[in-house]
Amino acid sequence: MTTDTIQQQYNDVIACHYDLDPQSVTGDTLDRATEQIRTQQLLVDRPDKLRVYDVGMGTGMFLTRLMALAGNSIQPFGLDLSEKMIECAYQKIPDLVGAVDTAANLDAHFPEQSFDLICTHFISGFVPLHVLAPKVWSRLEEGGYWSYLGATKGAYPNLQAKANNKLLQWMFGGRKLDVEGTVLSPKDRQEVLDTLDRNGFVVRQCETFEPKLRFANLDEFLDFAYYGGWLTPFVDAIGLHKVGPVTRWFLNRFFFPLEDHHCVEIHLAQKMSR
């Protein structure tokens, strides 16, 4: 799964559907991350603007939440791999200073700035947490905060079990849903905590969020997994979004409805001296 492939999927498939947020997983998760920041009082009684760098900002859904709480006291910066996603963010946030690049290069942009808050949301499946952590640390002010939000490999257990039965693998050319070998997400909460600690962060708040998912049929699944961006590389690899009427009937008859859950780690960590 190359950077160019991911970028193309976000530009051509995901960007125009992202804000629809089927199943409300993105919005509900961002609400929890926003609440962590609010209760830590990062937005209260500041003498100057809070410099926020949202890495993997998408269409600006998180920055708009912060600005709804703090208004003009936010100075927003953002990075995203998709030009189309950033265009959507500019429409919502006129003061946004943005750049197009992979999150692996987050430390290469806005070199004149250090930040009070850096947010990395749903990108550790593409850029490993151990790569992100030192780069985030280097761009934060002393005592600054990192809002980390990312899936773990424990997500979608029922989907993984169903998708990897022998009949479905045969139908799709022997290919399986290989989460372990495809995404770079941390294994679990402990891996997140250990990585943050090793890189000079103290976790101030953390939550494991497991929102329930229910897909009545293939169309509902594709709205979430393919067009919504959650499993686009997997769906694209096996051509699930292109199946004909017979395969669609079979899947709706024997695979759906499907109930499952996501698994997301939501952490607010503070930079400390090494």
Regions found by a protein language model. Name each.
Residues 183-199:
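Short alpha-helix
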